[in-house]
């Protein structure tokens, strides 16, 4: 955990290398800073929020996000700390559901249940990020 960072007055987006996956995908970290000095870092592997720095009443930033310090931690550990969840969130009992009279059978990856969309979950995918500094973006 990073602690004791001084607030910056500048807003913007910083892009930097974060690591390489075991599939040899280059992972990029994007750190966004707002006008209040709050910072959020997101990587393009799993769209994971790796850091959230919030200023305290003295203006000192503290990282309040729970996560891992490297790409390897996000690849091999089961908790999806800060990652996008999908195709569904939580468990689907008996890995099946009925919608409009049709029953859909899903992959069982949590005993007899389907957890967070199966083994090809969104948290283990690479995403393509685009930076934008448009107002309200």
Residue ranges with predicted function:
Residues 2-137:
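Surface-exposed acidic/polar loop and edge beta-strand patches at domain peripheries
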């Amino acid at each position: 955990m990073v602690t004791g960072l001084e607030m910056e007055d500048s807003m913007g987006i910083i892009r930097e290398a974060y690591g390489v996956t075991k599939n040899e995908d280059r992972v990029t970290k994007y750190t966004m800073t707002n006008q209040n000095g709050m910072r959020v870092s997101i990587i393009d592997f799993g769209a994971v929020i790796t850091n959230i720095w919030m200023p305290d009443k003295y203006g000192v930033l503290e990282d309040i996000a729970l996560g891992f310090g490297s790409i390897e931690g996000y690849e091999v550990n089961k908790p999806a700390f800060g990652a996008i969840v999908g195709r569904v969130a939580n468990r689907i009992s008996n890995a099946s559901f009925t919608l409009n009279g049709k029953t859909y059978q899903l992959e069982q990856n949590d005993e007899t249940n389907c957890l967070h969309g199966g083994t090809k979950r969104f948290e283990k995918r690479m995403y393509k990020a685009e930076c934008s500094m448009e107002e309200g973006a």
